[in-house]
């Protein structure tokens, strides 16, 4: 089939079951585009003449000539280019003759301003899916799309009057680009606080604060980004530190109740503030404990910093009243002239920025999220100094707010006058002086720990004393312990044997028997090694032991006895499984095998 002999008119089909809608001719200003797909039948079927049937549209008085004639098409098809494109679409039945002629119809949704992205789906799923996957035919008059994938069709650029015109069938990439560009144009003309999900706007500067939705964006076709660019922007926002311009709900911070601590080990090229201990190049981060000038025998390039740059309380709404950053100085030299820390009631508690990433080639940055209790974190450096600072994080709650679970004893009691004062620094927090004989003058100690209440310490001490075994029981003589153990049941003795090795040795050495024990105290049973029963025996069952080779009967002074396991009622008890019950040696008169035993003895 020659492609040059195909007709360029628009395809049309009626609605199912022969229902027509009103025919809407295209205005003369619209550009008539070539057909989306050629007819496999060679265009012989549309040339039926004036005969109107159910599948033929009624003739119209006005015909629109083609504004863009195809150069490769035949000249005889110029009179058929003025066909009217109906706003109807037809579900192709399998086996219909129109399936060979029409595959798709550009459907206009009643003069709306957006292009229809509806899939042409049929009610009969046998052959209609084949037509939906047809590729677009070759059109030499249409320019190929640019590498960016953004193509401005004439219907979207002519103005609001022609913005809702029919759009020819496009490929998947072209349709995605068209939808993205139309959404971007609509968002530029009508700024709204909510941005649709498929459109992602990337701010022009990555280092500065992120822009809002209604703020100035990049002009031109670069407004809507591709999928890869959006994914890269999302990953960059997730990996990058939080900026000051973000709101609190947009800030990528930890969850409620988490403490995020950033540690940075960098080289010594950054200058240090002499008195406050805060770096001058990092934007004044509070809570950074910088050691002092390096000693003669220490490395001058390494210093360890500890930044507590975000602390989110369990209640984010009452953040100023729930979170306090209290800094306690431990050194005696700077105790008098150090200024008091600002309370969150006076200034809004904006979290300090994270440490900068320009740490040099030898530095690295680690983010540690701590959700549990931080008792004490000790970091040893190589710089000898006395300026060691404690950073204490105190969580306080209002009296009407219930305490968070798991932190009942970690919350300080809030008095009626105001928040509690920071506890005084203890002696272990002081740095070792230069006059130490151990030579630890060049080791600086930076501690970050959380103070706990005195009630918690008392309760923890009482619980530990209750849980630990009594130490004075080890001082008792053995005969007293044996007498005490003889009054205990089976489960208590088993628990003592599993708890303390000393008690286990006494119980096994002296043969302590439980009060509910079924071991035979007869000395004749002392030679029986079988102490465990694992097999399920019936009452009166006589069989060999599973672990010890011994006869199933025993000749005793009072007659031949047979070994059997525990009774069925006692077999499920833990004592039987632990081997603390006795093995029953029953006489022939007690078991069903007594007659057989008597016959064996008579032989």
Curated annotation (Swiss-Prot):
PROSITE patterns: FBOX. Residues 347-356, 417-426 have a biased composition (Pro residues). Changing residue 67 to A: Decreased degradation in response to genotoxic stress. The modification Phosphoserine is found at residues 21, 67, 338. Residues 20-63, 111-163, 235-301, 326-360, 396-440 are annotated as: Disordered. Changing residue 216 to A: Does not affect interaction with FBXO31. SUPFAM superfamilies: F-box domain. Gene3D superfamilies: 1.20.1280.50. Changing residue 21 to A: Decreased degradation in response to genotoxic stress. Residues 152-163 have a biased composition (Low complexity). GO terms for cellular component: SCF ubiquitin ligase complex. Substrate-recognition component of the SCF(FBXO46) protein ligase complex, which mediates the ubiquitination and degradation of target proteins. In absence of stress, the SCF(FBXO46) complex catalyzes ubiquitination and degradation of MTOR-phosphorylated FBXO31. Phosphorylated by ATM in response to DNA damage, promoting ubiquitination and degradation by the SCF(FBXO31) complex. ATM-phosphorylated FBXO46 is ubiquitinated and degradaded by the SCF(FBXO31) complex in response to DNA damage. The modification Phosphothreonine is found at residue 347. Pathway: Protein modification; protein ubiquitination. Transmembrane segments: none annotated. It comes from Homo sapiens. GO terms for biological process: SCF-dependent proteasomal ubiquitin-dependent protein catabolic process. Keywords: Phosphoprotein, Ubl conjugation, Ubl conjugation pathway. One of its GO terms (molecular function) is ubiquitin-like ligase-substrate adaptor activity. This is F-box only protein 46. Residues 470-522 form the F-box domain.
């Amino acid at each position: 089939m020659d492609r040059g002999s195909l007709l360029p008119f628009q395809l049309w089909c009626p609605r199912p079951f022969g229902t027509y809608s009103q025919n809407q001719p295209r205005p003369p200003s619209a550009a008539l585009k070539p057909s989306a797909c050629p007819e496999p039948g060679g265009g012989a079927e549309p040339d039926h003449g004036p005969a109107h049937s159910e599948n033929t549209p009624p003739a119209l008085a006005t015909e629109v000539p083609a504004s863009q004639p195809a150069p490769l098409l035949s000249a005889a098809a110029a009179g058929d280019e003025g066909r009217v494109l109906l706003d109807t679409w037809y579900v192709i039945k399998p086996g219909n003759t129109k399936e060979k002629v029409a595959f798709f119809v550009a459907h206009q949704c009643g003069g709306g301003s957006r292009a229809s992205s509806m899939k042409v789906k049929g009610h009969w799923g046998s052959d209609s899916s084949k037509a939906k996957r047809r590729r677009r035919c070759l059109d030499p008059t249409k320019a190929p799309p640019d590498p960016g994938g953004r193509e401005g069709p004439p219907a979207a650029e002519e103005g609001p009057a022609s913005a809702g015109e029919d759009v020819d069938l496009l490929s998947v990439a072209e349709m995605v680009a068209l939808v993205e560009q139309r959404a971007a144009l609509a968002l530029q003309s009508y700024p709204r606080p909510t941005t649709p999900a498929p459109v992602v706007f990337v701010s022009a500067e990555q280092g500065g604060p992120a822009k809002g939705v209604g703020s100035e964006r990049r002009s031109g076709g670069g407004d809507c980004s591709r999928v890869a660019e959006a994914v890269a922007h999302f990953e960059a926002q997730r990996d990058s530190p939080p900026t000051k311009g973000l709101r609190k709900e947009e800030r990528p911070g930890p969850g409620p109740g988490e403490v995020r601590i950033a540690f940075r080990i960098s080289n010594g090229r950054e200058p240090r503030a002499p008195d406050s201990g805060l770096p001058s190049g990092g934007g004044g981060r509070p809570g950074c404990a910088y050691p002092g000038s390096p000693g003669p025998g220490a490395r001058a390039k390494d210093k360890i910093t500890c930044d507590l740059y975000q602390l989110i309380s369990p209640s984010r709404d009452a953040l100023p009243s729930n979170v306090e950053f209290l800094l306690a100085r431990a050194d005696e030299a700077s105790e008098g002239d150090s200024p008091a820390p600002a309370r969150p009631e006076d200034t809004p508690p904006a979290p300090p920025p994270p440490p900068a990433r320009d740490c040099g080639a030898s530095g690295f940055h680690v983010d540690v999220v701590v959700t549990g209790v931080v008792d004490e974190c000790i970091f040893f450096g190589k710089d000898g100094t006395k300026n060691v600072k404690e950073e204490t994080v105190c969580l306080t709650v209002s009296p009407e707010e219930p305490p968070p679970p798991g932190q009942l004893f970690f919350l300080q009691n809030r008095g009626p006058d105001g928040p509690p004062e920071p506890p005084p620094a203890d002696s272990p927090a002081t740095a070792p002086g230069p006059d130490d004989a151990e030579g630890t003058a060049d080791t600086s100690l930076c501690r970050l720990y959380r103070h706990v209440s005195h009630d918690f310490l008392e309760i923890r001490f009482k619980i530990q004393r209750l849980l630990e075994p009594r130490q004075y029981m080890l001082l008792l003589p053995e005969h007293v312990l044996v007498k005490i153990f003889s009054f205990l049941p089976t489960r208590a003795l088993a628990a003592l044997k599993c708890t303390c090795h000393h008690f286990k040795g006494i119980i096994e050495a002296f043969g302590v028997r439980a009060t509910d024990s079924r071991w035979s105290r007869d000395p004749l049973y002392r030679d029986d090694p079988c102490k465990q029963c694992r097999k399920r025996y019936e009452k009166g069952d006589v069989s060999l032991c599973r672990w010890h080779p011994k006869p199933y009967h025993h000749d005793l002074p009072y007659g031949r006895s047979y070994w059997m396991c525990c009774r069925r009622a006692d077999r499920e008890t833990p004592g039987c499984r632990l081997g603390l019950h006795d093995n029953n040696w029953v006489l022939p008169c007690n078991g069903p095998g007594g007659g057989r035993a008597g016959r064996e003895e008579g032989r």
